[in-house]
Amino acid sequence: GVILVNINPAYRSSELEYVLKQSGCQWLVSAGSFKTSDYHAMLQGLVPELAGQAIGKLHSERLPELRGVISLDAQPPQGFLPWSQLTGLAGSVSVEQLHERQDSLHFDQAVNIQYTSGTTGFPKGATLSHYNILNNGYMVGESLGLSAVDRLVIPVPLYHCFGMVMGNLGCITHGSTMIYPSDAFDPLLTLRTVAEEKATALYGVPTMFIAMLDQPQRAEFDLSSLRTGIMAGATCPIEVMRRVINEMHMNEVQIAYGMTETSPVSLQTGPSDDLELRVTTVGRTQPQLESKIIDEAGNLVPRGTIGELCTRGYSVMLGYWNNPQGTAEAIDQAGWMHTGDLASMNEEGYVCIAGRNKDMIIRGGENIYPRELEEFFFTHPAVADVQVIGIPCSRYGEEIVAWIKFHPGHS
């Protein structure tokens, strides 16, 4: 019955304190350190009372609901409960007690809180149920055609829905093998893992695939076992998609669209979709879900017209944790999740994302969608990645700026 609160390992002390306090976390499980972060030192600074109080009976001034910290290190500092001791406590719980607790759970209860980007203020805790994430992981796996013979390499973070739901739960619900190539993304290790493990599927965001495609040693690895995977998490450049299919043998690679608040996937291309659809759209609405495109007044727009994308169904979160106002702003009374993304839908139901509503550039009264310009830049063979933004301009209101990353050897 415990609710898992996913925490970004890159958080600094202030961000960690906010999430722990806002969610009301009672227990925290932590590694001792990772990369440049010393988590033990960070927690000792946030909770100086740790060293002087009994484990499990913590009373912290800054984090009043926190009762203890569990460390994955074998010999953590005083006040931290070692993981090895925690697992030993299971012997004090009877099978009858376990079954009683299991029987008390309901599929619609919260099981996971994932904090979304704080670009519009403090991060909000998207609260997801068993029903949300188990079904979404299953549906993603169904679209990929996963089975017990598949071996999925998961280099994406497990604290995000991409790794946790689309990766872990997608595999668990289909009997597929989960493979983690490294503790943090490394393009060389990921390619080596695919080759050594004869992986059939691979996940990644576009920048990950770009890094793997540009890895100088890529030709040394046999990637012919790959057949499918997902590129998601950000706009998927057309040229990158073509290279993944042609150079990494991922003939059935799919695009998935969604957000943390929708568990996460709402739309996905299918294995039978032709290349044109997979590189120009994010697919069609998943089974058991609904999508619509609306104008600023909330009215449906004609097919092919750009408006805000909204989705509804089993995948929509329970709400933002302890944030009823934020929940009401995101989910309307009819249950539609307002994504904030601009999109259009064709006659066959395929959706094309034009960009974020707030990212649209208005230059001299003209609406300009960064995605369209980015796709044009990607047609140049020297361009590895590009981001288009608008900046204030006294003459036109906004002016267009493009940040471009070149492939090695180009300028």
Residue map of PLM features:
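AMP-binding/adenylate-forming catalytic core of the ANL superfamily
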Residues: Y11-K21, L28-G32, L202, A297, ...
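ATP-dependent adenylate-forming carboxylate-activation enzymes
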Residues: V2-K21, G32-D38, S176-E197, M208, ...
